[in-house]
């Protein structure tokens, strides 16, 4: 659980969070808010020097590992996260938050505008996995019947690579 301005945010533990059906995120904080909060946090501790893309990626992978540990050894017969104990739900919320924070920090360091990148990638995915060909199928787009596009046809906007300092290279 996170605390913002003295208010507990996130999983309220109420029935709505465990109810099946539609879920939507809070409108705030935005990804830009998260980027700024993390940048301020790191600056206050003089940690920017350690936040090279490689280090941020390794920290992200470590947090994904901690998230995976929450699911490890659970059986298919056990309830999903909605049925977990409040302690397990709090751990889930913290690890998902850590993953998002490091993902946003890595994207910022590499100068990738995540909201725009997501829109571009979803467009590519729609072309790779047309609903009429991919519905109820777990097959990769290269294995779908004729009509799905190939990888070389699904090229998105030009990437702007970053060097080890996080600066864009030209």
Swiss-Prot record:
Molecular-function GO term, any one: dCTP diphosphatase activity
Sequence segments annotated as region (Disordered): 1-27, 147-170
Enzyme class: hydrolase
Keywords per UniProt: Acetylation, Cytoplasm, Hydrolase, Magnesium, Metal-binding, Mitochondrion, Nucleotide-binding, Nucleus, Phosphoprotein
Keyword Nucleotide-binding: yes
Cofactor(s) needed for function: Mg(2+)
Residues that bind Mg(2+): 63, 66, 95, 98
Induction data: Up-regulated by an increase in cellular dCTP pool.
Phosphothreonine, modified sites: 12
Pfam family, one: MazG-like
Activity control mechanisms: Inhibited by the reaction end product PPi. Inhibited by dCDP. Inhibited by triptolide.
Cofactor binding description: Probably binds two or three Mg(2+) ions per subunit.
Domain of life: Eukaryota
One cellular component (GO) term of this entry: mitochondrion
Keyword Magnesium in annotation: yes
E.C. no: 3.6.1.12
Subunit structure: Homotetramer.
Identification of the protein by name: dCTP pyrophosphatase 1
Gene name for this UniProt entry: DCTPP1
């Amino acid at each position: 659980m996170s605390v913002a301005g003295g208010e507990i945010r996130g999983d309220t533990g109420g029935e709505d969070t465990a109810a099946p059906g539609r879920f939507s995120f809070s409108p705030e904080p935005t990804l830009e808010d998260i980027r700024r909060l993390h940048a301020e946090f790191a600056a206050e501790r003089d940690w920017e020097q350690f936040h090279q893309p490689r280090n941020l990626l390794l920290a992200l992978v470590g947090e994904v590992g901690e998230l995976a540990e929450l699911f490890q050894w659970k059986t298919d017969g056990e309830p999903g996260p909605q049925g977990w104990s409040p302690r397990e739900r709090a751990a889930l919320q913290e690890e998902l938050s850590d993953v998002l924070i490091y993902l946003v920090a890595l994207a910022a360091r590499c100068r990738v505008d995540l909201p725009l990148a997501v829109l571009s990638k979803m467009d590519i995915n729609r072309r790779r996995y047309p609903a009429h060909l991919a519905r109820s199928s777990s097959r990769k787009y290269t294995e779908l019947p004729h009509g799905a596009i190939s990888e070389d046809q699904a090229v998105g906007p030009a990437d702007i690579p970053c060097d080890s300092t996080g600066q864009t290279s030209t």
